[in-house]
Curated annotation (Swiss-Prot):
InterPro entries: Cyt_trans-like (IPR004821), PPAT (IPR001980), Rossmann-like_a/b/a_fold (IPR014729). It comes from Geotalea daltonii (strain DSM 22248 / JCM 15807 / FRC-32). One of its GO terms (molecular function) is pantetheine-phosphate adenylyltransferase activity. This is Phosphopantetheine adenylyltransferase. It is found in: Cytoplasm. The keyword Cytoplasm applies.
Amino acid sequence: MPLKIAVYPGSFDPITYGHLDIIERGLRIFDKIIVAVAKNSEKNSLFPTDERIALIKEVLGDSERAEVDTFTGLLVDYVRDQGATVIIRGLRAVSDFEYEFQLAQMNRSITQDIETLFMMTSVPYSYLSSSIVKEVSSLNGPIEGLVPPAVKKALDAKFNR
């Protein structure tokens, strides 16, 4: 029986406990999840792509079922190249749905053989975003409970603490 593979794309700048929640729960459904870090030159990232990948790998540890990769170009092309058939997207609130719905419909118009699975973030992380974490951290606010210790350490280094 072929492996059920899903791709979980995002900028992960930085990865949060909300992202990890989606990965953990996604692994209950899929044999393998590829965490695909988008290389987006238009986005002003705090962490360069290689640092984001290293942080995600450190946080995921020795997971044989979660792989970290990077991609450019059309997501559906990348998903197909990986032998996956599903894109996982996390939703925090209704406000996320409209944008994600548009992306899913666009992907569907490009190819019929890749599905998008929306997963609601668990309640403790329903407000959490990488942007909020970066803002709170930049103002020297508490981010324990929002990101893993390795990410907090990396943020502290970025903000000279």
